[in-house]
Structures are given as C-alpha cells and as structure tokens.
C-alpha cells in the first residue's frame, strides 16, 4: 500500500509573521495619511525590542500634531463670536422682519418710467368700453383676429364640452370639433 503524502498548507510568500505593532509604522519610510498638509509627515520609529519573555511596551519618538491656526484677524475687526451674536440678535424669530425700504425718489433729470402693464386680449365680439385709455386699445387687436374667425354660436347638434365658449381666446384648430362642416 503506497503512502500518501500529507498536503502541507503553504503560506504565500508575501505574508509576513504577525507583529505586535502595525507593519506600516515599523518601516523608516514617511507615513502619510493622504491628506494635503503644510508640514511633512511624521516618521514613526518604535522604541523597545522583543525579548524572550515577552514584548516591551512601545513608545514613539514623534507624535503627529496639528499646528495652531495663525490669527489672521486684522486689528479693529470683530471676532466671529461677536459677529454671530450680532447676527443672532438681528435675526431673532420673535421680531417681525423689517419693512422694505422705499425706492429713492426719481431725480428731475431722468424722464419718468412708465409702469409696465400686461396686455389684455379681449374677444373681438365683446365691445370695448368707451373710456378705455388709448394704451389698451392697441391690445384689443389680438393675434387671433387675423387667422381665426370669431367664435361660432353653438348649434343644437354640437357638444358644449368640445366647443370653445365665447369670451375665451379661441384656438384655431379647436374652435368646434363636432360641428358639421359647412
């Protein structure tokens, strides 16, 4: 009976034996965290060595720290705390918002600006009022007048839902769908 060999579990070559400290801090290379900073990365070198009975607790020669931000405030400007307190006092929820300031009076050298009004398109069948100002009589000539006929009176056979009621702006294709052709 031939002897069978035991399959040994091979460890990959790139796997190292475990150490009590992280591998990235053992090397003498600069250890960077990947963030952009103005100072160089700190080099970690472990102090202490393993001996037969156990391991000496480790210490580090350099510890990273964040430098204090320089005071860039110019003399005479209030600090952020004073500004935030002032802002909080002016924008308290109890007080109503201040009314908007009125526009300055127009100077006598500039011509008065006319206020813009939206044009009112009236149906051609409705008669314009006699006291209409001349600025609104121009708007009475609606763009639908030249291309469409006035709204036809609904006949008995037409459906009131499909025909456009008089008084609204008629659309050319949908003035009356169900009315018979002439």
Swiss-Prot record:
Compositionally biased residues, Polar residues: 15-26, 127-150
Region (Disordered) residue spans: 1-26, 89-169
Chief place of localization: host cell
Composition-biased stretches (Basic residues): 1-14
Localization annotation: Host nucleus, Host nucleolus; Host cytoplasm
Entry keyword set: Host cytoplasm, Host nucleus, mRNA transport, RNA-binding, Transport
Region (Homomultimerization): 57-71, 124-132
One annotated GO biological process: mRNA transport
Motif (Nuclear export signal): 83-94
Motif (Nuclear localization signal, and RNA-binding (RxRE)): 2-19
GO molecular function, one term: RNA binding
Superkingdom of this protein's organism: Viruses
Comp. bias intervals (Pro residues): 96-117
Family, similarity comment: Belongs to the deltaretrovirus Rex protein family.
Subunit details: Homomultimer.
Entry note about domains: The RNA-binding motif binds to the RxRE, a complex secondary structure consisting of four stem loops and a long stretch of stem structure, present in incompletely spliced viral pre-mRNAs. This region also contains the NLS which mediates nuclear localization. These overlapping functions prevent Rex bound to RxRE from undesirable return to the nucleus. When Rex binds the RxRE, the NLS becomes masked while the NES remains accessible.
Annotated function: Rex escorts unspliced gag-pro-pol and singly spliced env mRNAs out of the nucleus of infected cells. These mRNAs carry a recognition sequence called Rex responsive element (RxRE or XRE) located at the 3' region of the long terminal repeat (LTR). This function is essential since most HTLV proteins are translated from unspliced or partially spliced pre-mRNAs that cannot exit the nucleus by the pathway used by fully processed cellular mRNAs.
Name recorded for this polypeptide: Protein Rex
Lineage, highest ranks first: Viruses, Riboviria, Pararnavirae, Artverviricota, Revtraviricetes
């Amino acid at each position: 009976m031939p002897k069978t060999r035991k399959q040994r579990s091979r460890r990959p070559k790139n796997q190292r034996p475990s150490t009590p400290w992280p591998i990235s801090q053992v090397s003498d290379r600069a250890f960077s965290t990947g963030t952009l900073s103005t100072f160089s990365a700190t080099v970690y070198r472990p102090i202490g060595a393993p001996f037969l009975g156990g391991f000496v607790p480790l210490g580090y020669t350099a510890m990273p720290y964040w430098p204090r931000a320089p005071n860039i405030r110019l003399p005479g400007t209030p600090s952020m705390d004073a500004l935030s307190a002032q802002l909080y006092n002016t924008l308290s929820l109890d007080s109503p918002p201040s009314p908007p300031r009125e526009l300055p009076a127009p100077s006598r050298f500039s011509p008065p600006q006319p206020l813009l009004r939206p044009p009112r398109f009236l149906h051609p069948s409705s008669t314009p009022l006699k006291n209409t100002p001349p600025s609104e009589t121009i708007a009475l000539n609606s763009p639908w007048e030249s291309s469409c006929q006035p709204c036809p009176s609904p006949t008995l056979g037409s459906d009131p839902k499909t025909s456009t009621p008089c008084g609204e702006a008629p659309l050319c294709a949908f003035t009356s769908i169900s009315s018979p052709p002439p």
